[in-house]
Every structure is written in structure tokens, then in C-alpha cells.
A protein has these predicted regions:
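Alpha-helical, low-charge segments enriched in small hydrophobic residues
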Residues: 1-2
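Extracytoplasmic and endomembrane cell-envelope/extracellular-matrix remodeling and assembly machinery
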Residues: 25, 30-33, 37-57, 62-233, ...
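Short, surface-exposed glycine/acidic/tryptophan-bearing loops
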Residues: 6-27
Length: 278
């Protein structure tokens, strides 16, 4: 995807289309207020680590990209079905149809970015490159609306620079603070009005008719021990995930389970935290 806020029908999110479990595996926070899969910098760093891991597995960048799209298991299976070929184009007929088209689309996009002008395309340069911005650690919960008001910054600009804040609210926890990214020209305005921004935020949050949502992280990695009477559908319902996800996380080819078997599950059951907002 070429949009930081992109989200697919199956839940792949952000510029690098991270699924929930893979994002968590590579350190991206997903909570009721924050989804770092939307953050271009953090998600790109995570994607680089993931791709490096896949390259270490397959020793080939084309295969690493195919595995990025469909998972290690599907690429390994395609290699086996192809008779052992270690080349993307030889195993392509044995890959899922979406993955068969993924690498050509990726390479075509890469080519267009590199040679756009040679083919008559006009490249729109960003009006606010990353080096023209900076971050501030927020000491008290605030909304982007309040920042926009006191720094005279367009709301669209703030949302563009801070895409990971799902509710346009920057939370503060007892044990963690978050950062606000601003144009360099607006840093001084924020610092000058910081106390007033916090005071306004406190008053507005207290005056809300509907209370703010509870902050909870969706990050539980669980090692589950299969018990008598368990089957994948039952376990999936228990942890609010899909059977296909459990199979993918554990490299299962069938639905067969053994008593005592250990399963890795990335549960969506929330872990609640207290907001340090007022």
C-alpha cells in the first residue's frame, strides 16, 4: 500500500500492510488509542527487520517478498510442489494467486518510482519532508484539535504527521509517554503555549458528556497447552481469533491437535491500563 492509513479487508494495516500478529511480533504497538502499523517510520523499521528475517530463511529477495505477502509456510510449500526450485518465477504457479501478482506489482511500483520522469510521469514532491519536522514528548493527554488551535496548524497536517493516533488523541500512561510530531516551524508555538494546551485539554476532557474510552493494549502473546476436548475452532473462539491464524502462527498443515501440544496465540483479549490524563 502507498497510503499510511490503508487497511485491507482482512485487516492488513498501514504502509507495509502488517497483520496484527506480525506487527506485534516486530514491536508495533496496537491499542485502543494507538496503532503503530499506521506510523510510516516505525512500520518501515519493522518491515525491514521482517524482510531481513525472511531473506535469512530463503537467501533470495524475491522469495523473501513472496513470503512477506503470503507467509513462510506458503513459500516453503510452493518450493516443495515445484520440485525444489529456489526461484520465484519457477514456484510462482504454486503460490496463492494474490502472491503470484504481488512481486510483479512490487517491482513495477519500484521501477516507476525510480524512472517516473523518463516515462513522462510528474512526481509530486512532499511539501513537508521528514527532516522538516520534529517530535515533542507529551506530558498530559491532549487532542490534535487542541494542538491545531494553539499552534495554528491545519488538522490535516497533524493527522498526516501523527497517523498512529486512532482517535486523534495522544494518551499518557503512568509508565509511558507518546510523542507529537510537528513541523519545525510550529515547535516554538507548542512550547510557548504548552501549559495552556494542557489546561484546555483537561477542561475539555472533564466536560465531555461521554467518557473517554478506556486505554487497553491488544498485545497478549499466549502459549496455550492443548487439553482434552480441545479443537481449533473451540480454541479460536476462546481467544477471539480465526482458525487460519492459529494454523499460520504455529505452522499447522491440518486441524489435528495432540493433548499437551503447545500453541502460540496472539490474543485480542485486551489488557487495560489507567490513563494519566487529568
Amino acid at each position: 500500500a502507498l497510503k499510511p492509513r490503508a487497511k485491507s479487508r482482512v485487516g492488513a494495516t498501514g504502509l507495509w500492510q502488517f497483520m496484527f500478529a506480525t506487527g506485534k511480533q516486530y514491536g508495533l504497538e496496537v491499542s485502543s488509542y494507538v496503532d503503530e502499523r499506521f506510523d510510516p517510520l516505525r512500520s518501515t523499521n519493522a518491515a525491514a527487520k521482517y524482510l531481513a528475517s525472511l531473506y535469512k530463511t530463503f537467501g533470495d529477495w524475491d522469495l523473501a517478498l513472496a513470503a512477506y505477502n503470503s507467509g513462510r509456510g506458503n513459500v516453503t510449500k510452493a518450493i516443495r510442489r515445484s520440485g525444489g526450485y529456489q526461484n520465484y518465477w519457477n514456484i510462482r504457479p504454486f503460490l496463492p494467486s494474490e502472491t503470484a501478482g504481488y512481486l510483479p506489482a512490487f517491482l513495477a511500483t519500484f521501477y516507476l518510482f525510480e524512472y517516473a520522469e523518463a516515462h513522462g510521469f510528474q512526481v509530486n514532491k512532499t511539501q513537508l519532508p521528514i527532516h522538516a519536522t520534529d517530535t515533542i514528548h507529551v506530558k498530559q493527554m491532549i487532542s490534535l484539535d487542541q494542538v491545531a488551535e494553539f499552534t495554528d496548524t491545519k488538522m490535516e497536517t497533524l493527522q498526516h504527521l501523527n497517523p498512529s493516533y486512532k482517535l486523534d488523541i495522544i494518551p499518557v500512561l503512568d509508565n509511558k509517554t507518546y510523542v507529537l510530531r510537528l513541523p519545525l516551524t510550529k515547535i516554538g508555538d507548542f512550547v510557548q503555549n504548552e501549559a495552556q494546551i494542557y489546561a484546555t485539554a483537561k477542561a475539555e476532557f472533564e466536560a465531555r458528556e461521554k467518557p473517554l474510552p478506556q486505554f487497553f493494549e491488544i498485545d497478549s502473546k499466549i502459549r496455550y497447552k492443548v487439553k482434552s476436548g480441545d479443537y481449533l475452532g473451540k480454541i479460536a473462539r476462546k481467544f477471539k481469533v480465526r482458525v487460519s491464524q492459529i494454523k499460520k502462527w504455529n505452522g499447522l498443515r491440518t486441524n489435528d491437535l495432540k493433548i499437551g501440544q503447545r500453541l502460540t496465540i496472539y490474543s485480542r483479549n485486551p489488557t487495560a491500563y489507567t490513563l494519566n490524563n487529568l
